[in-house]
Amino acid sequence: MPLAALKIPPGVVKPATPLQAEGRFWDANLVRWRAGKLLPVGGWQRISSAPLDSTVRAIFAWSDLGNNPYSVYGCEDKLYVLTASGFTDITPAGYLPADVGQYGGYGASDYGELLYGLDYALRDITTAVRSSNVVTITTATPHGYPVGMSVLIAGVTDTSFNGTFTIASVPTSTTFTYAQTAANASSSGGTAALPVADRRPQNLLYAQSFSWTFDNWGEDVLAVASSDGRLLHYNVGEPVAGPVGTSAIVNIVRVANVCTVTTQDHHGYAVSESVNISGNSFGAFNGTRTVTSVPSLTTFTFALSGTDTTGTGGTVATTKPIPVDNRAVIVTPERHAVLIGAEGNPRRVAWSSRENYTDWDFASTTNTAGFLDLDTESILIMCAPVREGTLIWTENEAWLMRFIGLPYIYSIDRIGFNCGLMSPKAFATVAGRCIWMGKENFWIYDGGVVKPLACDVGAYVFDNIDPGAGPLYTHGTENGVFPEAWFWFPSQGSTAPDLCVYYNYQEQWWGIGSTMTRTAAYSAGVYPYPLASDEDGNIYYQEDGWTAAGLPIQTDRYAETGALNIQNGTALSFVRQVLTDSGYGYDSTQLTFFSSFTPEGSETASGPYNPRSDGYTDVRVTGRDFRVKIASTKDAEWSIGQMRLDFVPKGGR
């Protein structure tokens, strides 16, 4: 009895028909290969007792010095943190969410990018007055802002006025108001502007979508939401995240004319720095003060004569300029915070002074803060860490930012053309390299070089991705448990990332999935499993167990071959037995055969057949062309290696 060994290479090849994928796996769902054996992808279990009430678009995880894990979840409308106590809403005050951040107007950009009728030019502020928790801004020229629009206030001398707010009323053409709970105060200077961090799609294959970016500064986290633009800071235990340079005050204690300020979080101030205190219960403490000492990360002192006393509450803010209207943030190994699209300049990369994310004084000769305005073809989109530095993308290019030391600190060189991202989050960093989905193919950065990445399922991706939702919601991540980069994208007609592909960068094969919608994901490492979210706001451990949060997956895990080359298709064959190299879990799988007598003829399905414990599977299949489907029957672990077919030649007819 002849035995035909089915030497099928790992991975899915997804051309138009099974015949075109001869001798390969043609279709699959949630399976992977390891050392030549076919395995099921793990299940997922919920770690949130209730869904978050906003769609998650980015996840980031880190640990403290005690190796306690934490994670933050950047949503369209909110920001959450997961600690040992569960999920907590830490959305910063005045946060501008995604659904109100995608504004536009005429005269400030290219035709068709922005909404007609709004002027995005900066308006100089003459006065800013806060009375009874209502701020009135007076501009030097008519502003043209409507009620309900978000407005970005920056550079006011009293920095407590700065931030993003919603316009409550427009008394005159040069005044508008917004609500802000703080002590009565007045100031001047600065500018008002409508945020334009996000824009309408410039074409069907690209839209500069909303995104969150995170990176840890030691035990703390820095963050930027592209719709909001502020550089945010969060320290575990704080009630909410807040703008860098601004801290909530626990109390101020004056003893012997020395005032000690205790803040709720790490303030980041330095000796001789000027800060503005507002809203403290003891009014004499409010005003602009000079830091005289910094006893700890959460305390500083200033001198003020008077009787010993204590005041509580309020806020303290640096008077130093902190960039606003930013696109993304990353922290380099040299301990510089880096902002992409900084200060509303879509081509600017700016970095803080070393070891101080609150020092952005670019004119200083005593720090290492600086910026570079790149000569790019298009605007900056996103950044990611790689072994040689920081990879930066524009809509169409890739740039590499490298540390070079004094006096220039960083250099930024263009290393790729026509290799832009499908969406701002459509990338995965893997072992110092980076893999990303472009607009028409996949790319890899490796060792300073950008090159196309061969993709056996590229047609499946780019023929099925939704041209409108794909540039908005496609995202990627490293798996972390397995050497794989995963990418989720919305299918035609869908607004949720409901299809996925994944690439094993060690064995160089591709897999596909169609039954697991995920809006964001993050690799294992800090946590034992990858983290992911679905469109309902549920948070999961991936690769945990074998079920879908307790629900069965079973036959949804499968791999289906293309045409099998038995006798080169020149004669009929009768297949009567299959010998399977099942490492374990043989009783958790089944085989279904598809046979036909001509390449274009109709197929006949035979089975499913259940493998026996001795490795044999009895079948009865006749045809000239054959295919086989391997599917799970249980939510359990299994493996299948090489298969051999026992067949009887039946002649040419």
Predicted regions and their residues:
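Structural hallmark of WD40 beta-propellers
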Residues: 68-70, 219, 388
